[in-house]
């Protein structure tokens, strides 16, 4: 209400005699005044009539408050006339009831009948966005501001009625007929009780209402009043309530006749009483202001004391009166001290002289109230005498302080006040004239003084008027002419209108013509046609100019420039994200059909152009004014110029008074002026060289020069001045803008300077500075500012995006990567691959072309400019060869290949359509279909390398931190250019800290081959990398995943060495990224390689695993203690289950296992201890050993938990990883063990997950904690968080594994010699890096559950291979486990990914779940704080349900989620770069845990697992998938190995034909064990891939629980293969399911501070249901991808998955076709930020295809994809998982066919999907790798012995559904997931429609 004033006019018709009575005039003037003061929109008014004399009249209409306007005023006049007309004769006679009673009754009705306190309809609950300052005010702040600004004027009742003036009238008013009998005067209290009783006062106070009485007494009655006691009594009463009386004269001013205000010069006195001319001389507004805001105005018109000397006859001593003087105008000169006023004489008929030569100041004289009453009476008597005689006194005013006396005239003003008019010094002659006259009378007494002075002064006065000097015109001639026509001009009019008119060029002739026009009668036809034509033309001209100005103002005031606010958009803002995305997609499809040519609606463009032109013009005009005002000096010599400039420069830096902007502008302008040249270009070139040589300093120079010399403020000021100088160069020398290289150089320098500023100032300061830059330069050089934002990795603000050219967001401009692959790279592709890729390329370019025209043709109702740019790079050449070489080369080689594509970007724009941008290393990855690749920036921290094992340091020059990742599969419009990446990295490099390297990661793992592996393992990893057999391998790691890997590594390092990374500007700007990367530092080299070869999911897995290991190990450790006490028992009872838990808990082991799987021969079997120590990455041997230990450890989860060695192993593992960054780190060797461990852990983890839904939660907490550690924002203990962070980061990688195989965590633990108990220890060590995780596990059973959860996660991963089917089962088992552990509720909730977010919340909510949830939340909050809001939410999705769902949907969701996450992240406020990458990575960290839970049971654990798994899920984007694949590759093997003695490795290989080929290899038991260990890890990785995918989904789901829905279709197979193939993954920004978050109010999120409901931004990313639906099948296949996608990613992943699938289809035709159709549609939507729904291909088919592809890769999707060997491997993995989980998996499969593929995975995946996507697409579970799907895979004959594989695509779904139902039986999550999935299905159909 503070924003709007409610005004009620309460009109007493008894005092109204005629329609044009004072009441009407007062009402009109009052409303005019209010509207002028507050604005028409801020005043709402209404009126009410009553009769104070009791006369009956028709009831007054009660209309609500309305805005001021002519219509409402007409209503008032009509009602007034009707009442006056209806009034019967005699109605004016007073009745028996007193007037006060009627007035009181009317007042009470007014207060009670109207809604004074109703809020504005337009903004019922929203804070008002003030136009000034553009800041949001809450209700209290708004009220306070309104009070301050409006002087307390809130709501008001204006009582328009005659006010009693005399005491007798007051008596009659209060007592009515009794007044005759009552002679006793009324006391104020009696009057108050009658007029304003306490009840009325209370109501007024409660509603902030003030009562003002507008006196409408007729003037004749006013003068007839004998006294004014009644008036002052009423006035005093009103003052108590803040009101007052507004006198009648206030409203009649300006309407008086001339003879009443100005006496004629004849000297004949008017016999009619009239107010002082002074009253009419005061402007009405000023009078009303003074009355309404008395206290405020008193401050503006300060009173001073004075003394009035009256000469007394016969006395030398003059009588003195104390008086107070109050200025009448604010601008007049004030007296400095008490003033002496001496009366000299008197004058009659004096009026203010109208003379330009006469200057006057006016003061009001009053007798101070505090002085004795006798003096006041005398003063009043003097005033009344002067009024009666109409005399004025002449006085000499002595201002003191040596100033000469001044002549003044004292005039009567009111009953107790006079006006002193002082003539200023220039009227000396006039003053002396008066003084001489007055002096002659000085000796007479006061009485005679008056009469005598009158005579003399009258003569003086005649002389005065005749005096030509004094009569000189004081105003222009035309004004005199106007005044001569009429004397009725009011002072207000003269004061306001004439000056304005004069300034506008009015002349006598013009005014004369106006008079002539006015004089002509309306019906006179003599007016010439030309006159009328002129009038018409003038009116048109004025109207047009007015309209144009209005348009410009509207443009300026529009909040979102260039984006029309349509009813549809307004409506959609209130929808859930999923619905919104659905409708956007639907409308966009319509728009595409309407504009097939891609021509966009031009309305927006035109509006934009107009706005830009208008703003540019304004900018130029403003600049012109500034330049004119700055009076540029002219210099004769260059030395003078330089001296002047140098002087100015120093002053600007030294003093804060000079604005740096104006100083820079002035200096550049001065130089330009000095270099006068006729040729503009020459001038600009000379000016630039001058500025460059004399003014500009580089950031390096500044850093060196300012090192110790200046204080921080000066440093910052100089940096800012340098920024302004460069921007001014661009602005004032436009020719610079024609040279892109120069602009780029300038932008880079500005970026460096801003980073320098960040060394001493926080990010908020930088934001303010950037806003200032934006405000100053948006109109002139928006493109340069846009590049600056890109360079900083910041999201482009809406208002800047509105003015940027459309080409700015296209690949050609900003997204071009500085390093494009050599053309020769294309030769790697086979002919068939080229054909397929050409088809895809055609699709890409077609969409890209449309995008360039206006990206996607959006329905005009929702058309808006896309902001987020991510680069998806699609390598033209298959990356396989390169990856394989890199893989073989060793982890150390990984960095080298990565260097080819070293990108320096904080935020990477993924170029989905630009294959040229791929680096050679990525190009060769997939030969069939070019798979998108990821580029990651690694920060090598030399100082950290000492703290960590140097295995990696040798590779990456020390501990490497994964800073950024670029995923090739991201739509172009969401990509960040490589140039940006380089710039950002460069910027980071400017920091004396770590070196930054770019690690390119492609879905294909080129580096994988580099690892020393047995051919079989190589093939497995290769298939994973290329075909994404287990999404971890095939799925490109998302940047987030990479980050998480790096974070995990860093976490491991931290675990080993709990030292928090140093905070630097880099940390500030890219903290999230760098933090996670820091975890990766150990695995940084690995990551680099891993990122590349991570495409060989192994490294990914390994990387992630190690991180996860660190994170998860500790996480699991911690989880295990908490949840694992039970879980431990369970684990003890069920070694497999135990393993699962430990695996999840021991992310490092899982990672190691995965690594072992990848390089089983080299590392996996070499040194188990090393593996443990080295963490998955370095632990090829360690992994092998680890795997067995893991297997054993799972048996003794508690032991594992308790084992400090585990923790140290975990920590050591990262070191180990460092030691052998390339080889060991590479999961190549470790994978076997990882597989083994994974398998072992898978089942246990599954069980754990089952039991551990809480554990998952706890794990999630733990993971979150770990994540926190990596995250600079981590809220938990810094050091432990660091450890946790490392762990979390590792865990995230592990989560990828975990998601792949919940075993992964256990495996990690095993690998790290950490049994479930040991993981607890690890967690315990989390405070130290390792201990924290362990502690967390111990701390929260939930965490343990979380650990368990990862196991299910692992199964999904295994499904990729063998684990996938198993994971579903494990989820059931996990649930059972949870129940067994007395955590069923938790397990149930967490295991209910199917139900989607809700289940997750449920699980979190359950006691265990809550514990895990809280722990996870805390961790999560850290991670989330790191990730940002979006990620937190996502991570929180870690609830089991989400995880399971995630697992399933991971691939697709991974991508979608990744994008969604990025988007969320951005929305969350993370830097775009950080957002895109860090969120993924962080999500990976946290999501892994979620992913694990994503495995249904793992869902709770999933949080923890998600953390580990998440990296891979996050990887779901091409990049994320690559990482996930990498992680999963290693991980799946591990899970396989772990699961069963007979292990089959399924390798998805991209054939030359472009079709993916599944290779199923049989792994010997030893390898299998290793694989199992790795598999457990891989399951974490693989299910991590699935669950990880799931987890990312879950993770995102936590941010937005929707992810689970989306990912499945794109899971590992499609995601991995396509991604690796370079296929583009469409990321459905808008597809991010919002369902998950809303449905999962898990305690995790609550604790983490992350909303379980999707954040608005997250919601915005909700994947349309349709999109989610079709990919769902594929996602089921792409279980891991799904989880990776996470909810944000899920949405994008649908398209992204599709695109991934597409790329995979390049490798795999079957997948390709469906993908293509999806991609086509996706692409178009992609432009919109929403994947287009595949109209062409049936959603389910597409999903199926993708699913099959994914499953094929996973071993779950399609049987055809699973070669016997691969299926066997999957089986093996699954067997391992299913050892414990199998029954449940089967149950899940049986229960929900749909979940069959998803069951385990389903928990997270579906949950994620459910949560992530409002549509039931989640329900469809994408059939990627749900927990059930994993189980189905596990059970499938191919994948598992004794198990029939469920149909990979359709069956997988069915199995998944079945498994899920079984899961559902076990846990409500399953059922919930089931329900949600169907919903998703419907959504998908809707989208297609």
Curated annotation (Swiss-Prot):
Primary localization class, coarse: nucleus
Listed GO MF terms: chromatin binding
Subcellular location field: Nucleus
Modification type Phosphothreonine: residues: 1134
Name of this chain's protein: Treslin
InterPro entries assigned to the protein according to its UniProt record, in alphabetical order: Treslin, Treslin_M, Treslin_N, Treslin_STD
Biased composition (Low complexity): 812-832, 1187-1197, 1339-1351, 1496-1508
Biased composition range(s): Basic residues: 1373-1382
Function: Regulator of DNA replication and S/M and G2/M checkpoints. Regulates the triggering of DNA replication initiation via its interaction with TOPBP1 by participating in CDK2-mediated loading of CDC45L onto replication origins. Required for the transition from pre-replication complex (pre-RC) to pre-initiation complex (pre-IC). Required to prevent mitotic entry after treatment with ionizing radiation.
One Pfam family it belongs to: Treslin_M
Ranges annotated as biased composition (Polar residues): 1020-1050, 1127-1179, 1203-1219, 1525-1543, 1652-1662
Top-level taxon of origin: Eukaryota
Biased composition (Basic and acidic residues): 1705-1714
BP GO terms, sorted: DNA repair; DNA replication; mitotic DNA replication checkpoint signaling; mitotic G2 DNA damage checkpoint signaling; regulation of DNA-templated DNA replication initiation; response to ionizing radiation
Assigned protein family: Belongs to the treslin family.
